[in-house]
């Protein structure tokens, strides 16, 4: 069953390019926000490890008095707002498009803008679920973990790591249970809390397939992260080479090449991440449909069995009365 779900999901990704068009911009904004968070965390970690607090405070004070401070804050706020809104919009627009493909036997293509506006019918519960589950996302947990280390210091690294490690495992279990929540909102019109409860119930009733799929998705994400890190190291290696060039003209020339390569690699990573997000969403959609269909089949079988048992009981009672 797992293999058929994965194959159907991959077929959907490769056949319908409208899904990639719909998800590219949200994935782009998501990667931008991710890089902002990573840059922030690495910078402050560097400051605390090498005791550069005075230099950092001086640099921050100078930045506050620059002409582009307001523009920088506005840009960060815009990236955050677009990331917060576009990610759930695109995700649930994709679900609507996938369901349309499935209903029409893979023959009816829908344009990206149709999927973009499909989210309107379910925006409030979808957005609520998106925010309720934010505290269980790995990025949020890692960010909070680094914050705790900065606040309490390296002396508390063992207890903090132990507690956050347990919480991370708990978050993985919770995220697995909530994997079907979006589909209950869209297809069964449930509210946010109801969808989370229904998703947990469905996941636990089908724990074997849900667990295997969730573990597979984790491996895919880890592989993507490794590839992204490898590609991100390349521009920094190039910049290190630039530092040894004595001629300013050559430095400018290679700097332009560095920027071009960095942009190309960033777009490639965004495309890779977008495709992975579509595949993951398609996989959970196929799993939801398969689990629902199997439960319906089992329920009908039990009903037929009960009817047959009742029929035999009635005939047996009639025969006994006849004798």
Language-model segments: residues:
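Hydrophobic alpha-helical membrane segments
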Residues: 1-323
């Amino acid at each position: 069953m797992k293999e058929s779900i994965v194959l159907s999901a991959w077929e959907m990704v490769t056949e319908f390019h409208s899904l990639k068009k719909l998800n590219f911009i949200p994935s782009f904004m998501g990667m931008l926000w991710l890089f902002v968070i990573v840059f922030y965390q690495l910078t402050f970690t560097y400051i605390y490890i090498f005791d550069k607090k005075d230099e950092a405070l001086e640099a921050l004070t100078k930045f506050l008095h620059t002409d582009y401070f307001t523009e920088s804050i506005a840009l960060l706020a815009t990236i955050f707002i677009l990331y917060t809104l576009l990610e759930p919009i695109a995700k649930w627009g994709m679900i609507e498009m996938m369901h349309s493909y499935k209903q029409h036997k893979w023959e009816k293509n829908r344009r990206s803008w149709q999927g973009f506006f499909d989210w309107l019918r379910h925006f409030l519960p979808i957005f609520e679920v998106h925010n309720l589950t934010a505290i269980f996302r790995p990025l949020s947990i890692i960010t909070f973990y680094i914050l705790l280390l900065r606040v309490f210091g390296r002396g508390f690294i063992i207890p903090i790591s132990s507690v956050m490690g347990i919480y991370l495992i708990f978050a993985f279990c919770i995220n697995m249970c909530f994997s079907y929540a979006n589909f209950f909102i869209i297809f069964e019109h449930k509210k946010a809390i109801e969808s989370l409860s229904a998703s947990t119930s469905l996941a636990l009733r089908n724990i074997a397939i849900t667990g295997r799929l969730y573990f597979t998705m984790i491996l895919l994400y880890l592989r993507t992260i490794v590839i992204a890190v490898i590609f991100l190291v390349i521009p920094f290696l190039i910049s290190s080479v630039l530092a040894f060039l004595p001629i300013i003209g050559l430095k400018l020339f290679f700097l332009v090449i560095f920027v071009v390569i960095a942009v190309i690699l960033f777009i490639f990573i965004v495309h890779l991440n977008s495709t992975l997000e579509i595949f993951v969403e398609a996989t959970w959609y196929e799993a939801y449909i398969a689990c629902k269909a199997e439960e319906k089949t089992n329920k009908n079988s039990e009903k037929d069995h009960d009817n047959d048992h009742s029929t035999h009981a009635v005939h047996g009672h009639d025969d006994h009365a006849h004798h």
